[in-house]
Amino acid sequence: MNMKKALIILALTVLSASLSAQTKKYVFTEASELNLIGKIHKETPNPYHRVDTMKYKGFTKGENCQVRCPAGLAVLFKTNSKNIAIKTEYGWQWESLATMPIAYRGYDLYIKDKGEWRWAGSKATSRKKPNETIVIVKDMDGEEKECMLYLPIYSEVHSVKIGVDKGAEISYLESPFRHRIGIFGSSYTHGYSTSRPGMSYPMQLMRWTGLQFLSLGCSGNCKMQPYFGEVLCDAEVDALVFDSFSNPNAEMIKERLFPFIEQIQKAHPDIPLIFQQTISRERCNFDLKTREMEEAKKEMAAKMMKEACKKYKNVYFIQTNAADALEETSVDGTHPGDYGYTLWAKSIEKPLLKILKKYGIK
């Protein structure tokens, strides 16, 4: 055996031992055995699915995949481990040019610090090694911490295991979040173009306000379909928020809005239904065809909602904004980046809280 081959074998042996040690270093707990929050339907055969697609029918193939993604779901737990690792078994995985892999197939960890949720780490597996163990935070002080781990927004998972150091403890953390506020929306609500799972506008609002938002964001597919209405009708919620005017065209808004409201109100007659105007898309700066289409649907939404707020009780319409003065918060001309979603959350926070307060939601 020549020297080159011997060095290669030695290097592979050391690497293999290192990887084996890294795996053995942690004791793993299935995330669903801890406190899984953010689910619009509490019970699903796969705990990481948002909707039971065996029960609810009518979805397109793409919609079926989307509602099986854990967008908006988070795991609450306590641990005194100095290091936290994650091991995942994926179902289908998505790819995107405008959304970070950490967002669509990775994890985002927050730790409570002086009463506030503070970012602690984010990471994703490599595409070639989806089942590898990743370390999301390391070298902490070993004091007990309250943790919130956001799950991937756009990849199905069958198992999520959280690893802590041998000898460390991990346990269920009671949720500090109040109420159950469902939010049905487009790719914006889903979190498209975010850098990590905790940066969609519902998740930012949730951390700021302490109110629990239950995301049913479905990229490109929030068009007030009756079968999505069935899902919302069966949800245990104190309020519903809608980003319903981003995907449908003007004619679809005109045809579907009132029947959709009536469908939801049959099941939830006494809760607030809060509809958001869609945001302005920066693509419209020079794309005249898109500008015309976007203006038409915004005008139709405003017209129909003016009538809806008079026609139906407990129906509201609020404005949104995801752009700064320079109009440079978009990633691709349609979807905001993290900062744009922060602006969106800030733009609706006060009117949303004012409405919710009327119903004892605070």
What are these regions (language model features)?
Residues 139-141, 145-222, 226-236:
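Serine-esterase "nucleophile elbow" of acetyl-processing enzymes
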Residues 268-273:
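A short helix->loop->beta-strand "cap" motif at the edges of active sites that frequently abuts
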Residues 6-15:
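Sec-dependent N-terminal signal peptides
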Residues 332-362:
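Histidine-centered active-site loop/cap adjacent to the catalytic His
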